[in-house]
Amino acid sequence: MSTWRKRLATAGLSVALVAGGIWVLNRLDEAPLPHAERVTTTASLDIARGRYLARAGNCLACHTRQGGVAFAGGRGIETPFGVIYAPNLTPDRETGIGARSASEFWRALHNGRSRDGRLLSPAFPYPSYTRITREDSDAIFA
């Protein structure tokens, strides 16, 4: 086999290994969500605590575009990977997270996974948010 064919074969194998590695890493930590019903009534203390945590975490900074409705998303954030648009975090069932469960919110916040299991990178999981407890995540979701 000639030298250029060996190099081509090595390059092809390298690309295949990298692609396979990326695929495997994308599937790690993809545990199924528990089947839990969405809580329809929430204690006012949880709502107040969630409001406090959302403000302390500065969620408005990314999830509110200039002059827009609080937490309604749409703000474009320049990154080395291109512009990322923050999603709507309002309780609206069609455009926000109102149709989501607390478990789905936790999975996005803590594990950086979408409702269907896709990675939300490069934005999530945001390193400091992986330390948020499930209890705090549920309060923010409330």
Locations of the language-model features?
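C-terminal capping alpha-helices of c-type cytochrome domains
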Residues: 21-24, 101-115, 128-142
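N-terminal type II signal-anchor transmembrane helix
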Residues: 2-34
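Electrostatic cytochrome c docking/interface patches
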Residues: 31-55, 99
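Gly/Gly-Pro-rich "capping" loops immediately C-terminal to redox-active cysteine motifs
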Residues: 66-102, 117-134
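The canonical Cys-X-X-Cys-His
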Residues: 50, 56-66, 105, 140
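N-terminal/domain-start segments enriched in small and hydrophobic, helix-friendly residues
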Residues: 22-40, 94, 110, 121, ...
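Aromatic/His-enriched, Gly/Pro-containing loop or helix-boundary segments
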Residues: 39-42, 91-97, 101-111
